[in-house]
Swiss-Prot record:
Lineage of the species this protein comes from: Bacteria, Pseudomonadati, Pseudomonadota, Betaproteobacteria, Burkholderiales
Entry keyword annotation includes Hydrolase: no
Domain of life assignment: Bacteria
Gene coding for it: rsmA
Protein name, UniProt field: Ribosomal RNA small subunit methyltransferase A
Record has Transcription as a keyword: no
Binding site for S-adenosyl-L-methionine: H13, L15, G40, E61, D85, N103
PROSITE patterns membership: RRNA_A_DIMETH (PS01131), SAM_RNA_A_N6_MT (PS51689)
Any Pfam family the entry gives: RrnaAD
Cellular component annotations (GO), alphabetically ordered: cytosol
The family this protein is said to belong to: Belongs to the class I-like SAM-binding methyltransferase superfamily. rRNA adenine N(6)-methyltransferase family. RsmA subfamily.
């Protein structure tokens, strides 16, 4: 089968190191009847060993040439190919207990992580290859330089663990950054959760819009509605110093106080 030229517009970097592939599959630990969805299968580096261990795999691939290649390589009863941009796919359609895996396109990694939150109720776990710097932000703690909107939004929904680094030489073509593999498991239904997901997202986005400024200045007219002492947030605090639970409390308090611009559930 002819070689496929990596396409920059799709952020393609094909994993070629078999030892890394084996480490990822071992971390996933797939069982024969698992419901697995792979994003960006590319040249089948993960697809092949996954299909050695499970009965059926669903693959989401935007590149029509690679999608056609996958259909030629594997029978339809083993592999379902969804030819689409992962950012437009409703992952909830694939059922309950999903195990989502993939070497995610680095040019859309953050938007894709936010998009996948919409299907978190259907997901058992997620194992992704990403830029190491993105994973550092995902798992960052308050007060660190990597703590960001991405940290807060994902930590409110998932338990996350950085598993191991992957050198650029493991890919063709090699990316200019170090990569890593992360495990994401949705938090249980009884987790601390905001009264309104939309309000929470709006508050966090506003707070981090000027992360170096004091939060009370960034919040503007919302600051007067904020019960600072009750939330345990110093009025001089910056967004990067506020914990996930405090952000949930802040969003709920502002929503209850009728803060303008916040959507009610």
């Amino acid at each position: 089968m002819s070689a496929h030229q990596a396409r920059k517009r799709f952020g393609q970097h094909f994993l070629t190191d078999e030892s890394v592939v084996e480490s990822i599959v071992r971390a996933i630990g797939p069982a024969r009847d698992d419901r697995v969805v792979e994003i960006g299968p590319g040249l089948s580096a993960l697809t092949r060993p996954l299909l050695d261990r499970i009965d059926h795999l669903t693959a989401v691939e935007i590149d029509r040439d690679l999608a056609a290649r996958l259909r030629r390589q594997y029978p339809a009863e083993r592999l379902t190919v969804v030819e689409a941009d992962a950012l437009t796919v409703d992952f909830a359609q694939f059922g309950q207990g999903l195990r989502v895996v993939g070497n995610l396109p680095y040019n859309i990694s953050s938007p894709l992580l936010f998009h996948l939150m919409g299907a978190a109720e259907q997901v058992r776990d997620q194992h992704f290859m990403l830029q190491r710097e993105v994973i550092d932000r995902m798992v960052a703690e308050p007060g660190s330089g990597d703590y960001s909107r991405l940290s807060v939004m994902l930590q409110a929904r998932y338990r996350m663990e950085m598993l191991f680094d992957v050198a650029p030489e493991a890919f063709d073509p090699p990316p200019r950054v170090v990569s890593a593999v992360v495990r994401m498991a949705p938090l249980p239904a009884d987790r601390l959760r905001p009264a309104s997901d939309a309000a929470f997202e709006t508050v966090v986005a506003r707070a981090f819009s000027q992360r170096r400024k004091m939060l009370r200045r960034v919040l503007g007219d919302w600051a007067a509605l904020t019960p600072w002492d009750e939330l345990g947030i110093a009025p001089t605090a910056r967004a990067e110093e506020v914990g996930v639970a405090q952000f949930i409390g802040l969003a709920d308090a502002l929503l209850a106080a009728g803060a303008p611009g916040l959507a009610r559930p």
